[in-house]
């Protein structure tokens, strides 16, 4: 889906209440679009760990405008599935990163080919 509002409208159809009941959660999932405006923004929160983080931030449940308690995890799962078709793990994402020298967090002065980490 292209916009958090569309996710929120989908949540309202699925769980009841109004789109505004869910918009904060969906805005949070897509917040990274503000600094990385293509599909790769999803690497930060669109995975199982992101769903559990949303639950820690927003609480285990929210109460929608119909007075129903809705698990935040269900809303997060819906968002990620609508965007990706499944719920990946953070490991699924991170394992696809091509390590770069700067990512190791240390300087490699004096490293020889025998001691250099593989892939560098």
Can you say where each PLM-predicted feature lies in the sequence?
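N-terminal membrane-targeting hydrophobic helices
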Residues: 1-120
């Amino acid at each position: 889906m292209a916009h958090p509002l569309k996710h929120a409208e989908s949540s309202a159809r699925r769980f009841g209440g109004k789109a505004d009941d869910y918009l904060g959660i969906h805005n949070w999932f897509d917040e990274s679009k503000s600094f990385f405006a293509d599909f790769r923004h999803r690497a930060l929160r669109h995975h199982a760990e992101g769903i559990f983080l949303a639950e820690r931030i927003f609480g285990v449940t929210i109460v929608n405008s119909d007075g129903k308690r809705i698990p935040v995890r269900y809303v997060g799962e819906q968002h990620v599935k609508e965007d990706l078709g499944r719920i990946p793990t953070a490991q699924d994402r991170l394992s696809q990163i091509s390590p770069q020298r700067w990512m190791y967090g240390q300087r490699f002065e004096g490293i020889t080919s025998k001691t250099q980490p593989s892939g560098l």
